[in-house]
A protein has these predicted regions:
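Active-site neighborhoods and metal-handling regions in enzymes and metal-associated proteins
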Residues: 1-173
Length: 173
């Protein structure tokens, strides 16, 4: 759970801080069935009105996820998929220095990653058909953050999300 002062970083430490009105909260969730793993991240806002910066950033991230999905298919290079994301960020003057995803699927403790594909600039790894990847478009800004992630099954000409959860950022009051 990314909230409060921990909302601007990935994988924060646990705290006893209480959630407060006006906070944007991201949840990173994982599921596992017979050692097949999936990840999912979504964001909510506590209160009656989303901040303009959250609305604007969410639109960019959604456009970026759409661009990533359009370029992720069998035999695509991981760096080209990352470039589709970066092109969207460049249009809006935003920056994300960390990778945007990795292979996932069959995993064994202590970690669910397969350590074979990493979506980062200039990565030359070819994404094979039937790979399963976790694309994480987290934007950790100064004092706040938001996340959208999907676990995607790579097919011959496209990819398919393994979840059907909305990308919308709901208000919780």
């Amino acid at each position: 759970i990314l909230a409060g002062k921990s909302a601007s970083t990935a994988h924060p430490m646990w705290t006893d801080d209480k959630l407060k009105d006006g906070q944007t909260v991201s949840f990173e969730l994982g599921g596992c069935r017979k050692r097949y793993n999936v990840g999912l991240a979504r964001t909510v806002h506590l209160g009656n009105k989303k901040p303009a910066k959250l609305i604007e950033t969410a639109k960019v991230v959604e456009e970026g996820m759409t661009a990533v999905k359009a370029t992720l298919f069998a035999n695509a290079k991981a760096g080209d998929v990352h470039k589709a994301w970066q092109n969207v960020l460049d249009k809006f003057g935003l920056e994300k220095k960390s990778r945007i995803g990795y292979s996932i699927g069959v995993g064994y403790p202590p970690d669910w990653g397969e350590h074979t594909i990493s979506f980062r600039p200039k990565e030359q790894t070819v994404v094979p058909e039937n790979a399963v990847v976790h694309i994480i478009l987290g934007m950790w800004m100064d004092g706040w953050g938001m996340e959208l992630s999907e676990t995607l099954h790579v097919r011959k000409h496209d990819c398919m999300a393994l979840s059907k959860f909305s990308w919308d950022i709901p208000l919780l009051s």
